[in-house]
Regions:
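Short alpha-helical scaffolding segments that buttress acidic/His motifs in well-ordered protein cores
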Residues: 19, 35-40, 70, 86-94, ...
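Secretory/periplasmic and organellar redox-cofactor proteins
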Residues: 1-3, 104-119, 125-149
Length: 149
């Protein structure tokens, strides 16, 4: 899967650095990151993204039930309020970004759980997942792969 990045070495290298920053340098708690990532993956219908798991997940209380219920982020009792808010942000980021921008009630709720710094990390992470997931899906790259980070 990584081989396709070598076709465009400058952009591929930049995407690799951005990916590294999202997965290894952001400040999101792992469960928050994973619910947001998976919500974007659902919106993108990206099989490789949906099949990706973090090897540290079990230590953070993430099991397959966590992933199985991402589409039920509003109601599944296994998610915290912070995780629900991250899932809502990610879902709306991927499906209706202008309404998200204008939803003052959402932003008030969001600031109950996240600082501006964490929101910035969440938004930039969603940007990576949305863009990369769509590239993978549109070009049919790795759609049968399962990855462990």
């Amino acid at each position: 899967m990584a081989g396709w990045l070598s076709i465009s070495p400058e952009l591929g290298g930049a995407l690799g650095a951005f990916t590294d920053a999202v997965y290894n340098r952001n400040r999101l708690p792992l469960r928050v990151r994973e619910i947001a990532r998976t919500a974007v993956a659902e919106a993108n219908e990206c099989a490789v993204c949906l099949g990706t798991r973090d090897r540290s997940g079990a230590d953070a209380g993430i099991d397959e039930h966590f992933y199985d219920h991402v589409l039920e982020w509003e109601s599944w009792p296994g998610y915290s309020a912070e995780e629900r808010t991250a899932a809502e942000f990610a879902h709306r980021f991927a499906t209706d970004h202008t309404a998200l921008r204008d939803d003052e009630d959402f932003w008030a709720r969001c600031h109950e759980h996240f600082s501006d710094e964490i929101l910035t990390d969440l938004a930039l992470s969603c940007a990576l997942w949305l863009g990369t997931g769509r590239v993978l899906r549109v070009l049919d790259i790795g759609q049968t792969c399962k990855l462990t980070l």
